[in-house]
């Protein structure tokens, strides 16, 4: 995956010059769903009022589509990057802050990203850049004459071992509410038996032998979860091949031919018609000549409870998609952070525990996102045979264990009047609300049993409880604050949830 954002003043990515595109793209990376995304969200918000009985092929009609409640309530989904790139399963590893990328550093040396891309799913591109770490790795391990698509028979053999029911059971166990599978990444390799012929690939190199999309869709829905599909509309290296070495190259590598537009349209229509996904997740934009206004109308008429992300870069989206970062305040338009457990989406065999989010970091990431009206789409990167690496399973289960105790403060909630606060001794807090209750989530273990939460005023007769513990807690007003006595033994780990009912609190500002 590679994130891209554009201005509404230009249709799709038809910028007036490469320089303009490059400047815009770097800014897009640096912001990555922050201020610029807020402007995009404002410009593309749903129109108020009742949705139409039938959507017409016009943006006016399509913009009447409301974000369905299931997506607002879900909070946590699983993203899956699995494909040819899962055979070599290699990329340079990053060091540093695991919580979010510092995208602004790209402006200093934009080519650095493409030479040292930590996303293993970009293997085909990075191995095509002579003298890059991935190029050297590929030559040393496979030889200079080993083509990327020589991985096809290996993947087809290994993927026969995959058991989709085991994945779906795990996703249900860890508390995910929806799943988004990559159906075609930038390498053009399809994960379903498409009837749409790729004119630039031999039939035995076009896609997986197994209907991976269909098999997982069936297994996920059997567990009561929603199923979504990712499709790379903006890049397909079977139409415009690698390497992409800088942002100017990226501009030139987005196919704009009538041939590709028809190919992408046919793919998306086939995915919708065959699998009826609950999430339609595009990447990098979409060909200018594509027929999206008709496709969106057809999709919503067939799947009224479906949602569409913002990366098609047209006049409509249901949610925005910051990548490896999140917003710093409550955002009215629904949003979804996507990221891997490590620095790569696809499996990177060189990533160790030092590159992977800890259970505490993972829990706090989810809590922070939910407090600001977001969802977390957390990626797993399976091996070629479909096994999920142990460390990824461990992290998912740690999050799932926390959610079993504290999910009441996550699922089905909405942001409170402010997303965060502190105790007087400096413990960070995130707030959510649901029904007649407010949840104050302590982001670390307090040092003392008695804590004071600043600028909160509960009504007389309110009750305070800690999720996972029994009984009501003793509380009192302390000026403009609330003082709470915590249980002697705090339940669980990582973050601790106070539930205040009723939620008739007043925020007192100096």
Predicted features along the sequence, with ranges:
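Sec/Tat signal peptide C-region and signal peptidase I cleavage site
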Residues: 41-44
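Mature catalytic domains of secreted/periplasmic carbohydrate-active enzymes
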Residues: 46-510
């Amino acid at each position: 995956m590679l994130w891209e954002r554009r201005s509404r003043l230009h249709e799709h990515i038809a910028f007036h010059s490469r320089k303009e595109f490059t400047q815009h793209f770097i800014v897009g990376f640096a912001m990555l769903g922050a201020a610029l995304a807020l402007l995009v969200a404002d410009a593309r918000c749903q129109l108020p009022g009742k949705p139409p009985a039938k959507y017409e092929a016009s943006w006016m009609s399509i913009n009447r589509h409301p974000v369905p409640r299931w997506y607002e309530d879900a909070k946590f989904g699983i993203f899956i990057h699995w494909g040819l790139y899962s055979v070599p399963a290699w990329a340079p590893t990053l060091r540093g802050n695991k919580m979010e990328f510092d995208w602004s550093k790209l402006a200093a040396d934009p080519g650095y990203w493409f030479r040292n891309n930590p996303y293993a799913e970009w293997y085909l591109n990075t191995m095509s850049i002579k003298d890059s770490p991935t190029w050297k790795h590929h030559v040393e391990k496979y030889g200079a004459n080993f083509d990327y698509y020589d991985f096809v028979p290996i993947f087809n053999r290994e993927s026969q071992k995959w058991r989709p029911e085991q994945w779906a059971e795990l996703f249900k166990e860890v508390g995910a509410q929806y799943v988004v599978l990559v159906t075609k990444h930038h390498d053009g390799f399809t994960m379903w038996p498409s009837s749409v012929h790729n004119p630039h690939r031999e039939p035995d190199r076009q896609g997986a032998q197994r209907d991976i999309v269909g098999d997982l869709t069936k297994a996920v829905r059997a567990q009561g979860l929603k199923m979504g599909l990712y499709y790379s509309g903006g890049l397909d290296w079977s139409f415009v091949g690698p390497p992409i070495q800088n942002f100017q190259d990226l501009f030139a590598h987005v196919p704009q031919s009538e041939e590709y537009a028809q190919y992408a349209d046919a793919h998306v229509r086939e995915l919708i018609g065959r699998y009826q996904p609950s999430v339609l997740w595009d990447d990098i934009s979409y060909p200018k000549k594509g027929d999206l206004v008709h496709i969106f109308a057809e999709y919503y008429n067939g799947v009224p409870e479906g949602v569409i992300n913002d990366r098609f870069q047209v006049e409509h989206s249901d949610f925005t998609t910051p990548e490896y970062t999140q917003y710093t305040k409550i955002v009215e338009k629904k949003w979804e952070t996507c990221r891997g457990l490590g620095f790569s989406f696809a499996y990177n065999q060189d990533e160790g525990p030092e590159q992977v989010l800890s259970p505490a970091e993972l829990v706090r990431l989810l809590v922070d996102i939910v407090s600001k009206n977001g969802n977390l789409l957390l990626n797993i990167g399976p091996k070629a045979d479909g096994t999920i690496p142990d460390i990824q399973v461990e992290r998912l289960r740690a999050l799932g264990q926390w959610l079993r105790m504290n999910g009441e403060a996550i699922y089905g909630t909405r942001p409170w009047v402010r997303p965060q606060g502190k105790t007087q001794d400096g413990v960070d807090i995130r707030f959510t609300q649901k029904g007649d209750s407010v949840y104050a989530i302590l982001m670390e273990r307090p040092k003392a049993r008695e804590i004071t939460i600043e600028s909160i005023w509960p009504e007389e007769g309110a009750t305070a409880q800690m999720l996972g513990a029994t009984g009501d807690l003793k509380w009192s007003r302390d000026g403009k604050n609330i003082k709470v006595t915590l249980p002697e033994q705090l339940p669980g780990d990582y973050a601790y949830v106070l539930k205040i009912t009723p939620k008739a609190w007043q925020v007192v500002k100096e």
